């Protein structure tokens, strides 16, 4: 990687990191019903980083988790944000091998849905670990874990994916 590419990579990583930290702090459109939270656009920087590089995605995910922590979200939501490391890393490595996925609407939809499932499973698992460690009776949490967090995450993830894809494609055309 030449110096110009390295500089561009670092600059993009820094910009996406700043966005990932700021969104949980300043986004006015959010619904928080712990352990569920829906902040419009909260995954956009992660997805754009994922479209570009696994290492960029990992760094932006860690920064996003810090953003949720700094914004004062409950720790279970911060843990959910950190669980993005699974879908972000898997997605980034997949796209490295299959970059054409983003340009084919059918492949992109399937990729988005599978990513949403991985995303939801990781978030539900993070919640289960958190609540099991606090002594909470998980039997009474089916609705919260599988409807609010699980299904809600799939929908939220898929919406943010398409927002990120639109931004990514627009920027790619201009560059």
Describe each model-derived feature in a short phrase.
Residues 1-175:
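Loop-helix junctions at membrane interfaces
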């Amino acid at each position: 990687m030449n110096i110009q590419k390295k500089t561009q990579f670092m600059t993009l990583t820094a910009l996406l990191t700043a966005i990932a930290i700021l969104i949980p702090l300043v986004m006015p459109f959010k619904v928080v019903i712990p352990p569920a939270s829906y902040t419009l656009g909260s995954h956009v920087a992660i997805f754009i980083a994922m479209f570009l590089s696994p290492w960029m995605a990992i760094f932006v995910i860690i920064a996003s988790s810090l953003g949720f922590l700094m914004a004062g979200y409950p720790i279970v939501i911060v843990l959910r944000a950190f669980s993005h490391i699974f879908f972000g890393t898997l997605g980034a490595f997949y796209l490295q091998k299959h970059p054409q996925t983003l340009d084919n609407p059918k492949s992109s939809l399937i990729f988005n849905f599978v990513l949403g499932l991985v995303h939801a499973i990781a978030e539900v698992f993070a919640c289960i670990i958190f609540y099991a460690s606090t002594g909470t009776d998980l039997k009474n949490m089916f609705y919260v874990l599988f409807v609010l967090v699980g299904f809600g995450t799939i929908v939220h993830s898929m919406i943010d994916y398409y927002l990120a894809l639109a931004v990514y494609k627009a920027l790619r055309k201009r560059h």
